[in-house]
Amino acid sequence: MQTPKKFSSFSDQVSWISDEKGIKINDREYAEEMLRQIGYFPLMGGYKHLFRISNTKKYKAGTSFEEIVSLYKFDAELRELFFKYLLQVERQMRSLMSYYFTEMYGAEQKQYLDANNYNHTKRNHATIVKLIATLKRATTTTDYTYINYYRKTYGEIPLWVLANVLTFGNLSKMFRVFPQSLKSKVSKNFEPLNQHQMEQFLSVLTKYRNVCAHGERLFTYRTVDAIADTPLHKKLSLPQSGNQYEKGKQDLFAVVIAFRYLLPGKDFLEFKRKLIKEIDRVNREVEHISEVELLNKMGFPETWKSITKYHLK
């Protein structure tokens, strides 16, 4: 077991980065300020690796501290951009799921707390039990004035109100155990998606939403689960290993594919425009990482911009 690292001042940290890491410091005052604002571990621990020479601990000659900061800021801008549209998808799912559930079962609180109103198979049993417990807790929360108002005024909270306090993860689990008829009604709003593709999209997007919300490193993140194959995977000629696509399944490009199906066309074009702008900016500012390297780390094919050329079916 190694000896724990000792405290070091911001000035000492800058010296360590320069002398021990061999990273160029163009402005010590700027470097100290960035370490003060961000912290050594989130910055260096999270973003230095792309500047290393493969299979060594050495850095590419000429790598500067400013480049590492630029990569960090790029990731922060990515989180903000992706989070905006993840929230948009989340809002629409709240609306559609509560609408179709209430249309089928009615607005009474007891309906969404009834396990019989879900696809109550042996496989889904544990998920449904946990979901109903979550929904019950949400009905008793005092953190939201509108929940308090409905409880005091009407004695219960309809699902279209309660849905606003549920997390993306709650919504994903709820969709997973919806009856097939309800899954179908929701999914038809995103044709040509089928129920399975929709379910996998929600599962993966939940993970990415959490990464964005908690300020974790986004651009290299991968989920354990994967989105289902779509016609876009084939049309984009994404690389395959055997029958499995190597990109656009568990990586950030999987989220882009999901957005292509889930966002209105004009919103996706705006998202794509902003994404191109951020990638172009970091490519100008970061000399020692090529665009191909960066895109590969993100799980993007080099031809990713052509995603809007193809029909979704």
Model regions and ranges:
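Extended intrinsically disordered or low-complexity regions, especially N/C-terminal cytosolic tails and loops
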Residues: 1-207, 219-313
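Acidic/aromatic/glycine-rich contiguous surface patches that form carbohydrate-binding/processing clefts
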Residues: 215
